[in-house]
Design a protein with these regions (language model features):
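Alpha-helical interface subdomain recognition
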Residues: 2, 6-7, 70-72, 86-89, ...
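Flexible, small-/acidic-enriched active-site or ligand-binding loops
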Residues: 50-77
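Glycine-rich phosphate/pyrophosphate-binding beta-alpha loops
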Residues: 14-20, 63, 100-104
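A short core secondary-structure module
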Residues: 5-6, 10-55
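Short, charged, solvent-exposed linker or helix-capping segments at domain edges/interfaces
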Residues: 39, 53-56, 79-87
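Short, solvent-exposed loop/turn segments at the edges of secondary structure
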Residues: 20-22, 38, 66-68, 212-213
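Short, solvent-exposed coil/turn linker segments
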Residues: 46-47, 78-79, 133, 198
Length: 215
């Protein structure tokens, strides 16, 4: 709500990455709900502003090293000069930001999956079953091959999206494809890595269970 030379913020947002550590918040909020997305603006808000409170870190299944909290705003006054994008522009800025962050998430998924594949490959060469390493069994070889196919495909999709961004070109479609494919691929690869480890994969003695949760 605009009040003189200040915007007044009220509300709560969940799932804020680094919510407990941030010095600044980039806040997207509505000044006119009747205008729907065209009524959204964005503001730069210092985390020390009176009326801001962040919750305790959310106890997540995966990505536990990432500080994730709720952030509550209660009558937080923000000067008009902190306006980053006004009505009709805030939503556009939010969508354009995804063109950068989606490839970043995608490449994280690629790295996570690659680690899982390398660990599973190493374990498969060491684990002896029926007198030979399980890496010699065709069923395991198929799983490792599918991992490599998915990882390489995801990496290329991410590179394409990132290359377009580096050139200042619009990459909304490519960024969305890269993130979606890489995220699904990481889930498949880490699940198969746990399978290759067998019962050991279900324990915290080996890191593949963590990779699966993070995926």
């Amino acid at each position: 709500t605009l009040d003189g030379d200040h915007y007044v913020l009220n509300g709560t947002k969940m799932w804020i990455t680094n919510g407990g550590f941030a010095d600044l918040y980039l806040v997207f909020g509505s000044v006119d709900r009747q205008k729907k997305q065209k009524g959204i603006i964005s503001l730069i808000v210092p985390a020390t502003s009176p009326g801001i409170r962040h919750g305790e870190p959310i106890d997540k299944m995966g990505q536990r090293a990432s500080n994730t909290t709720a952030v509550t705003f209660k009558n937080v006054r923000v000067p008009k000069e902190n306006l980053l994008a006004g009505e009709g522009e805030g939503f556009k800025k939010a969508m354009l930001a995804l063109d950068i962050t989606r490839p970043m998430i995608g490449i994280g998924a690629v790295g996570l999956a690659r680690t899982a594949m390398e660990l599973a490959t190493q374990y498969a060469k060491q684990r002896i079953q029926f007198g030979v390493p399980i890496a010699n069994h065709q069923a395991v070889q198929f799983m490792l091959a599918d991992m490599a196919i998915g990882i390489d495909a995801a990496r290329l999709l991410v590179w394409r999206a990132a290359s377009l961004a580096d050139q200042g070109m619009r990459n909304s479609r490519e960024a969305a494809i890269a993130k979606a494919f890489a995220a699904d691929m990481a889930m498949r690869v880490t699940t198969d890595a746990v399978q290759i480890y067998g019962a050991m994969g279900y324990t915290k003695w080996h890191p593949v269970e963590k990779l699966m949760r993070d995926a």
